Amino acid sequence: MSVPDRKRALEAAIAYIEKQFGAGSIMSLGKHSSAHEISTIKTGALSLDLALGIGGVPKGRIVEIFGPESSGKTTLATHIVANAQKMGGVAAYIDAEHALDPNYAALIGANINDLMISQPDCGEDALSIAELLARSGAVDVIVIDSVAALVPKSELEGEIGDVHVGLQARMMSQALRKLTATLARTNTCAIFINQIREKIGVSFGNPETTTGGRALKFYSSIRIDIRRIGSIKGGENFDIGNRIKVKVAKNKLAPPFRTAEFDILFNEGISSAGCIIDLAVEKNIIDKKGSWFNYQDRKLGQGREAVREELKRNKELFHELERRIYESVQASQAPAAACVDSESREVAEAAK
């Protein structure tokens, strides 16, 4: 078949498909603007935004946040909710654990008067509510807290001690098949918080696994593994927060397996000033000599906590350092992009 004949045959097939399934059911990828325009919601931790590679969590996709107890999963999800609201968006929180603290959510920055919350009785109801909210097209981010608390209806109606093999995994698999397409169509971000369990009888390799079967791992565009790695001491040697390490275990939108560290303070959530200090020192924007931190010809303070308080007071300095960090990251990425472009040109010339 000649090239003109192939082109006419393709046009006829496209015309028939659009007649059968509606306009826009098939198109070239370049004309599909949503394919290369990914809108994001900031996480509240600049180090994590940079590790994700796209500046935050993507809208229109599924994100899984998993880790052990008291590692900051709910705090991270609540920061994403607060940032979505600050952008003028609408957020919903499906609290299957019945454990969301409205005072802590407000302290982090969430507008609890506008935050929609649902506390369903069973897993099927929770996932149906999430799907209906996404289908409305009016919600920007939906948090499901947590997968482990999504109890199937038949298990809820049974007796304690009854065995239900694979029931929750089947429920999740069926729900995610419907939810994925709806989220992409309405540009809604769904965040699933998950717990970890130990696999029995594992002698080699990682014995940890997440609840809810394999479907969520497959359908998630991003999986964030969050862990507490230490405590932050304040005055009189009291704990005032936790040091958190995050690993991007899966990423369909940027290179995976990047790591980030940040502070979660008990009285304010994720410390954005702490992220700025860490990144500015790493990029040699702030000069650290002993316990003193200096920026250009100015002494910021002695000790990390003093500098943190200075950045919280001086918003102009905070935003200046943030801008310089972004500029440093973009400058470091430019040579790699130029190298890829030159390799692409060489391949194209060789193909000719």
Swiss-Prot record:
GO terms for biological process: DNA recombination; DNA repair; SOS response. This is Protein RecA. It comes from Chlamydia trachomatis serovar L2 (strain ATCC VR-902B / DSM 19102 / 434/Bu). SMART domains: AAA. Can catalyze the hydrolysis of ATP in the presence of single-stranded DNA, the ATP-dependent uptake of single-stranded DNA by duplex DNA, and the ATP-dependent hybridization of homologous single-stranded DNAs. It interacts with LexA causing its activation and leading to its autocatalytic cleavage. The keyword DNA damage applies. ATP binds at G67, P68, E69, S70, S71, G72, K73, T74. InterPro entries: AAA+_ATPase (IPR003593), DNA_recomb/repair_RecA (IPR013765), DNA_recomb/repair_RecA_CS (IPR020584), P-loop_NTPase (IPR027417), RecA-like_C (IPR049261), RecA-like_N (IPR049428), RecA_ATP-bd (IPR020588), RecA_C_sf (IPR023400). PANTHER family: MITOCHONDRIAL DNA REPAIR PROTEIN RECA HOMOLOG-RELATED, RECA. Belongs to the RecA family. The lineage of its organism: Bacteria, Pseudomonadati, Chlamydiota, Chlamydiia, Chlamydiales.
